[in-house]
């Protein structure tokens, strides 16, 4: 069996009668699906535990995600292979705490609010692959290393170091954020995953059958960057927003790397190094996108390639 614990925010205030109505429907639905657990309403926050067969629990949570009465759903814990239920006698025990002592309610609301906010903040700083592990009930620290082929994308801002010395910290930060926002949105829209930000640089990856999607991501990012430049208005630095992109394809090792102090879920391999070198060549060639030969060979569209010859990659044997 599987168990999921989540917290969410009610989209509107609920009276005791409205909550009781929700409780009755919840009991009926969960009884039919043989899902047990507990549902707590404290102020504007729902806290719920669902337990049962995996397919039934997943379907129940998916239904809740589409329920307009819930927003900001944060999955706190997922457990698999449970041998027994924690709430075997309840189809869905419901608890309404809003009529309890005001001091207790205030403390509970603060706790749930802080929990939801902390979770949201951590999600913003956490690798999507790590979040998926957690939501699937897998400890990322125990996940095995996997060797697989990936399309690696590196992107960075042209002349960033030079521009940084002439403008305020706020303008430089806004400049970098605008670029990273454009590229990140394009990456996710095309099915890729942003792996990390490194100052003005971004590293992302795609599955090997998404070579053309990765190229489209670069082209769409450049188009959006041109749009931002043409609409710079009073934003001085935006007039100088240019970027370079490098693509490589090859085997990498994906997993958690680091130390006892800090871990990073990322990818390692020669393809990563090659993609980083590719983006550096955009400066000397005057081309906004540089790809290595295996990317070109794996693409299925006619991209009107321009052969620029062979380049010696620093650190490569040949």
Regions found by a protein language model. Give the residues of each.
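Charge-rich, low-complexity N-terminal segments
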Residues: 1-154, 162
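Short beta-strand
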Residues: 37-42, 193-197, 237
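A short glycine-enriched loop-to-beta-strand structural element that forms part of the catalytic core
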Residues: 74-76, 80-84, 238-256
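Catalytic NTP-binding/metal-coordinating core of nucleotidyl cyclase/transferase enzymes
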Residues: 142-213
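Alpha-helical scaffold within the catalytic cores of cyclic-nucleotide enzymes
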Residues: 177-189, 208-245, 249, 274-279
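Catalytic/regulatory signature loops of cyclic-dinucleotide turnover enzymes
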Residues: 248-249, 270-293
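Short, surface-exposed loop/helix-turn segments at secondary-structure junctions
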Residues: 257-269
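Cytosolic regulatory/linker segments at or just downstream of nucleotide-handling modules
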Residues: 284-318
